[in-house]
Amino acid sequence: MKIAVLPGDGIGPEVTREAVRVIEALGLGDIEMKEAPVGGAAYKAYGHPLPPETLEIARLSDGILFGAVGDPDCDSLERHLRPEQAILGLRKALTLFANLRPARVFKGMEDFSALRPEVAGAIDLLIVRELNGDVYFGEKGFRTAANGDREGYDVMSYSESEVRRIAHVAFRAAMGRKKRLCSVDKANVLETSQLWRDVMLEVAKDYPEVALEHMYVDNAAMQLVRAPGNFDVVVTGNLFGDILSDQASMCVGSIGLLASASLGERETEYGTFGLYEPIHGSAPDIAGKGLANPMATILSAAMLLRHSLGLEVAADRIEAAVAKALADGVLGRDLGGTAGTTEIGDAVLARL
């Protein structure tokens, strides 16, 4: 089993270090972790945010543990050389098409949510977002109409095969949870969404144990605030998923607890190849000070073990240890506590 560790910039190296410690402490044996530079750190050393050697290490792995990229020193570089291009390059080169964003309020964390504690406490959902299609990747541009009026346009489109592959990811995720899947679209006005809904219904026949429901995106946004506990797995397109996943993040209350996965088409010997990262950025203002909360990265490592290495029990152990540490009051500064990066890592290790 091979894990590519790409720490990146800012607090990336600090938080990935704690996640690596947790993986090592599990005593799983046959896991090889190989570190490689990425982002601004890679540009400064090799002249490119995603060196060929780093990409090759990523390709040969079963899963990637990614820290964060972003360096103020690189802000004046040409766009293709900026640190952020590393993650975009990895997604494209490795055909990562399915973003998994869990949103869970751990016991004792209810007051950090923007919602009432009794509502927030019920949140435990997973948003599955398609990454490679939709309006972000359609034809776009500017044009001048016959009357001289300037127009901007972006074409929203999905192919049946694109919808089908994300549908299978979502149904499989639902099979491992409460067997409930909500497909979010806008089929009452968009042809793209009508195709989306048709394909979801077809794929549902392969998963008779999963209860599928459909919801318009405007209603989904309301229900996510009104009764988030009613959701288990949510699957949606790129644009809607971009918005809903950030909304779900605020329902949780702190990005320091939010992990994510981007899965590809390749099946490894143990699971599905993917890239795993916290949703927070590189936070250069606190880099190197031991202040960053590594829990999101540790939870990302748990997702890697579950989805790419097939180590469900090990992933459960990590998540339980994080939950116990939070319940015991081990809080980073993002949660109003005083615990530093290493202290939080030690607390999780002690509760494995």
Swiss-Prot record:
Gene Ontology BP terms: L-leucine biosynthetic process
Chain positions recorded as substrate binding sites: R91, R101, R129, D218
GO cellular component: cytosol
Alphabetically ordered keywords of this record: Amino-acid biosynthesis, Branched-chain amino acid biosynthesis, Cytoplasm, Leucine biosynthesis, Magnesium, Manganese, Metal-binding, NAD, Oxidoreductase
UniProt remark on cofactor binding: Binds 1 Mg(2+) or Mn(2+) ion per subunit.
Residues binding NAD(+), per UniProt: G281, S282, A283, P284, D285, I286, A287, G288, K289, G290, L291, A292, N293
Site (Important for catalysis): Y136, K186
Family recorded in the similarity comment: Belongs to the isocitrate and isopropylmalate dehydrogenases family. LeuB type 1 subfamily.
Protein name: 3-isopropylmalate dehydrogenase
Originating species: Novosphingobium aromaticivorans (strain ATCC 700278 / DSM 12444 / CCUG 56034 / CIP 105152 / NBRC 16084 / F199)
Gene name as annotated: leuB
